[in-house]
């Protein structure tokens, strides 16, 4: 498990440390918890795909329960949550984590919002080549809130289409799984972006942070692409 560290300076009220964990897809919870504890975060942020499907969700639920015992834990809804036959939001809420289903809350002076995957309207996930749109009305309303705003948004491909022109300070995403196979610093494929995707890992335009994620939803292995969690430190700018 790789811990990737990013440090940004911005208009936060105080320095804050977030552990960012994405795309669990049934990955065993113990190594993820150990890595989270190593980062000593103020809170844990999970931008979707805690659950894989009806047959593979228990490890993700266990991780959420353990995280919520030790840290404030905030979760948004990814596309795989909608592969559950039961209500995924209710299931996630039972863990004690704060589930942000097109909602926001405040933590340490930071407004944390969760933009739900557009697959809520396409639960069979027939849009293989493109991603259904999110709730743009909620997104617009969130962007108008005063203060420093962090958006948990599972799909990085939403950024150019719906988010780039919004007044949102930081966007945290996953979904691309680092491009699955990585060669010469580039990923090969990402769902919703296709071959040679633009957004696979790292920081883009100074405000879109994309995690490689932890698990693997495909039968194809990850190559040159270790599971990662991110330690994101946001430091208060000096005036």
PLM segments and residue spans:
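Active-site-proximal beta-strand elements of phosphoester/diester hydrolases
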Residues: 15-25, 109-119, 150-154, 207-213
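Active-site neighborhood of phospho(di)ester-bond hydrolases with catalytic His/Asp-centered motifs
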Residues: 20-22, 43-49, 72-79, 100-102, ...
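Binuclear metal-dependent hydrolase catalytic cores centered on His/Asp/Glu-rich metal-binding motifs
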Residues: 90-95, 108-150, 159-161, 221-223
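Conserved beta-sheet core of the metallophosphoesterase superfamily
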Residues: 156-233
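N-terminal membrane-anchoring alpha-helices
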Residues: 1-14
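Short extracytoplasmic
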Residues: 13-39
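Acidic/histidine-rich helix-loop elements
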Residues: 17-26, 50-58, 83-86, 120-130, ...
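Core catalytic region of metal-dependent phosphoesterases/phosphodiesterases
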Residues: 29-108
């Amino acid at each position: 498990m790789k811990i990737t560290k990013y440090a940004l300076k911005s208009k936060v009220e105080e320095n804050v440390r977030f552990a960012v964990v994405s795309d669990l897809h049934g990955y065993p919870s113990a190594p993820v918890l150990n890595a989270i504890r190593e980062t000593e975060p103020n809170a844990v942020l999970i931008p979707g795909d805690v659950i894989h499907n009806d047959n593979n969700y228990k490890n993700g639920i266990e991780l959420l329960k353990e995280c919520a015992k030790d840290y404030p834990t905030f979760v948004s809804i990814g596309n795989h949550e909608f592969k559950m036959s039961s209500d995924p939001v209710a299931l996630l809420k039972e863990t004690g984590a704060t589930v942000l289903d097109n909602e926001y809350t405040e933590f340490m002076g930071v407004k944390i919002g969760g933009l739900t995957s557009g697959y809520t309207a396409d639960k069979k996930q027939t849009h293989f080549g493109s991603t259904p749109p999110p709730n743009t009305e909620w997104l617009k309303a969130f962007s108008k809130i005063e203060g420093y705003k962090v958006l948990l948004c599972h799909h990085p491909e939403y950024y150019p289409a719906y988010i780039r022109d919004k007044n949102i300070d930081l966007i945290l995403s996953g979904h691309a799984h680092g491009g699955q196979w990585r060669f010469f610093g580039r990923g090969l494929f990402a769902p919703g972006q296709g071959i040679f995707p633009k957004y696979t890992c790292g920081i883009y335009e100074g405000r879109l942070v994309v995690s490689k994620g932890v698990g693997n939803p495909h039968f194809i292995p990850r190559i040159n692409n270790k599971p990662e969690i991110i330690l994101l430190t946001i430091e208060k700018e000096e005036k």
